């Protein structure tokens, strides 16, 4: 399963602040993709965030809705007012956090967590508990917290690689140990070392049943797992076909337009160049069968394949465009290719058509 956190983790990207209407528009688009959960925000942040969350909860979407919350009764009261069914309660339990951030003992922290979970449960909420910075928290502390969560009938535990620095094999081992407690496990993997997707996959292999992601990999610092990538991994490697791959590019563009942040051109699945072919040998092969250089066809993602034209082009590149232009004189291929290869600038299709007409004359 997939939880999308574009509206919570994604909004922690510097420069990103959604209006209530934008929050709703993104939630509707994610519901159409078919994600299982949407983390729609942290209602205690501001009145604007709260209003947007309430607006989403009133829509009757098919997806499960979850609100983020500190282990505070007042935060949970905000969550209850939004009308969602799930609350995600988090608290850091590492010795460093307990001593330096909170200046409390582990016993005190567990009492605080227990009060928050019991309050949420007593008020009808389903609870996901996240020991923040799970991967760097001492196992003795984690074990006590997870046992407490099980006693309190927490619905899900989230394993958070908060600094995005854990080695995938170590992440696998940790998730496996936590899965053995018998509580359904989420994984929340940051991308500070570029390991978010690898860690998410290792989490799945270890028995986690839900992965957190955001559109375009938005989030604090280097962000978290990208939604399009994890959904495609689930489809391609695990045979999970319930998500709308053909809508991933559209939702990426929607979020880019709203946030003003676009993926890098070479970004997988949704980047501008993800299905662009340049080298002549590649183009020649792709025109025969896209599977030579595409693991899935561009059309699966609602995209079009692009053939790029510059000095790396080959004759098949030129023939491809001549046919698109309706020019059947293949005798000009060599002359036109010579023109392309002598230029330091790429050729747009308009420029190529103009040059083809000139050469043909």
Swiss-Prot record:
Coiled coil: none
Chain sites annotated for binding Mg(2+): 9, 188, 190
Signal peptide start-end: none
MF terms (GO), sorted A to Z: homocitrate synthase activity; metal ion binding
Lineage: superkingdom: Archaea
UniProt keyword Manganese, yes or no: yes
Pyruvate carboxyltransferase domain span: 1-251
Names of required cofactors: Mg(2+); Mn(2+)
Described purpose of this protein according to its UniProt entry: Catalyzes the aldol-type condensation of 2-oxoglutarate with acetyl-CoA to yield homocitrate. Carries out the first step of the alpha-aminoadipate (AAA) lysine biosynthesis pathway.
Official protein name in the record: Homocitrate synthase
Organism: Pyrococcus abyssi (strain GE5 / Orsay)
């Amino acid at each position: 399963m997939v939880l999308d956190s574009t509206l919570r983790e994604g909004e922690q990207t510097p420069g990103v602040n959604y209006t209530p209407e934008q929050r709703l528009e993104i939630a509707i688009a994610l519901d159409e993709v078919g994600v299982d959960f949407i983390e729609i925000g942290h209602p205690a942040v501001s009145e604007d965030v709260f209003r947007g969350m309430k607006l989403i909860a009133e829509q009757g979407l098919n997806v499960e809705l979850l609100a983020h919350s500190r282990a505070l009764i007042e935060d949970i009261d905000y969550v209850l007012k939004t009308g969602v069914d799930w609350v995600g309660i988090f608290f850091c339990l590492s010795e460093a956090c307990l001593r330096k951030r909170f200046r409390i003992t582990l016993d005190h922290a567990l009492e605080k967590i227990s009060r928050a979970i019991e309050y949420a449960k007593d008020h009808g909420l389903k609870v996901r508990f996240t020991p923040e910075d799970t991967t760097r928290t001492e196992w003795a502390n984690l074990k006590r917290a997870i046992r407490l969560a099980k006693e309190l009938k927490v619905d899900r535990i989230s394993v958070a690689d908060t600094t995005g620095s854990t080695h995938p094999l170590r992440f696998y081992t940790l998730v496996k140990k936590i899965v053995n407690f018998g509580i359904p496990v989420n994984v929340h993997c940051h991308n500070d070392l570029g390991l978010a997707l690898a860690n998410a996959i290792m989490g799945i292999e270890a028995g986690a049943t839900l992965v957190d992601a955001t559109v375009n990999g938005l989030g604090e610092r280097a962000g978290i797992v990208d939604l399009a990538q994890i959904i495609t991994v689930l489809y391609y490697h695990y045979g999970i076909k319930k998500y709308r791959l053909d809508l991933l590019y559209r939702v990426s563009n929607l979020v880019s337009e709203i946030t003003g942040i676009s993926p890098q051109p070479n970004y997988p699945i949704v980047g501008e160049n993800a299905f662009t072919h340049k080298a002549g040998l590649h183009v020649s092969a792709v025109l025969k069968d896209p599977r030579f250089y595409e693991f899935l066809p561009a059309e699966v993602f609602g995209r079009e394949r692009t053939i790029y034209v510059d000095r790396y082009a080959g004759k098949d590149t030129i023939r491809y465009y001549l046919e698109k232009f309706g020019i059947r004189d293949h005798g000009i291929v060599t002359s036109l290719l010579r023109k392309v290869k002598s230029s330091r600038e790429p050729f747009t299709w308009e420029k190529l058509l103009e040059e083809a007409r000139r050469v043909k004359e």
